[in-house]
Every structure is written in structure tokens, then in C-alpha cells.
């Protein structure tokens, strides 16, 4: 018996309200998976921006506050970044810290799909970390499988 491999891509829009903000994308990606053609496979989620990162964690408010505080302390905004220096860079956003934070977190995720739904642990959620907002953002969701 031959199994047909399907692939379906879609864009997901996201509007953020703060410079540093964590957004739970799980319900929106789950809806795309449930309405998509793939029953078993993988969902690839990719940020289309260098200052919007993706990660998996739980959505407990205090924990998300801790993550934001940790990122801000680990990679401070005012540090004399070369990317923020007009003599060295043509970037007018002065957002080097956001690029460095995103580099630490990553820009893509691979989540298993089984029986037409995402496979996540009890407390796991797909989270977007806005690191240079507020902005209008795009994510690409690619479903691959059968």
C-alpha cells in the first residue's frame, strides 16, 4: 500500500502590543492543523522575522514574566551594541538586543501531528517572543505528512 505525503503551507499573522511580549500561538496553530489535510506528520512553524522568536514552554503568567525578566537582564537593551551605532550600522531601530535574544531562542519549531492534532505535553504551549514590538508579524506554518 502506497502512502501519499501531503504538504500544506499557510501564513499566520500576529499583531503585538509591547516591545517585549510573549504570545501563546497554540490555539491558532492547532486550528490550522485541525482544518488542514495532514492527519499524521509534523507541523513546522517559522518566524518570518529576525526579532520574533519561537519556543515551547508553559503559559503560567509568573513564569512568562520570569522569562521576560531573564532575557532583559541577560541581554540588556543599552549595552553599546555595534548594530545600534550609526557609524557602524544602517539600522535605525536600535534593536541589537532583540536580535541577540532571538538568536538565543530560535526562529522555528517542529511539532508532531497525530490523529489530526498537535502532540504537546500537558503544560506545553507554542509561544512567540516579540522582542522588538509592537509590530505586525508573520509566521509560516507548514504541515507535512499523510
What residue spans do the PLM features occupy?
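Active-site histidine-anchored catalytic micro-motif
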Residues: 1-146
Amino acid at each position: 500500500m502506497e502512502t501519499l505525503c501531503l504538504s500544506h503551507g499557510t501564513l499566520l499573522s500576529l499583531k503585538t502590543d509591547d516591545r517585549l511580549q510573549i504570545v501563546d500561538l497554540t490555539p491558532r496553530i492547532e486550528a490550522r492543523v485541525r482544518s488542514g489535510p495532514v492527519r499524521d506528520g509534523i507541523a513546522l512553524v517559522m518566524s518570518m522575522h529576525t526579532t520574533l522568536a519561537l519556543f515551547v514552554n508553559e503559559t503560567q503568567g509568573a513564569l512568562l514574566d520570569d522569562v521576560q525578566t531573564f532575557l532583559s537582564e541577560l541581554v540588556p537593551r543599552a549595552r553599546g551594541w555595534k548594530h545600534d551605532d550609526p557609524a557602524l550600522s544602517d539600522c535605525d531601530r536600535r534593536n541589537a538586543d532583540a536580535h541577540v535574544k532571538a538568536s538565543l531562542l530560535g526562529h522555528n519549531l517542529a511539532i508532531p501531528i497525530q490523529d489530526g492534532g498537535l502532540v504537546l505535553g500537558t503544560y506545553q504551549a507554542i509561544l512567540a517572543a516579540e522582542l522588538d514590538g509592537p509590530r505586525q508579524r508573520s509566521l509560516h506554518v507548514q504541515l507535512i505528512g499523510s
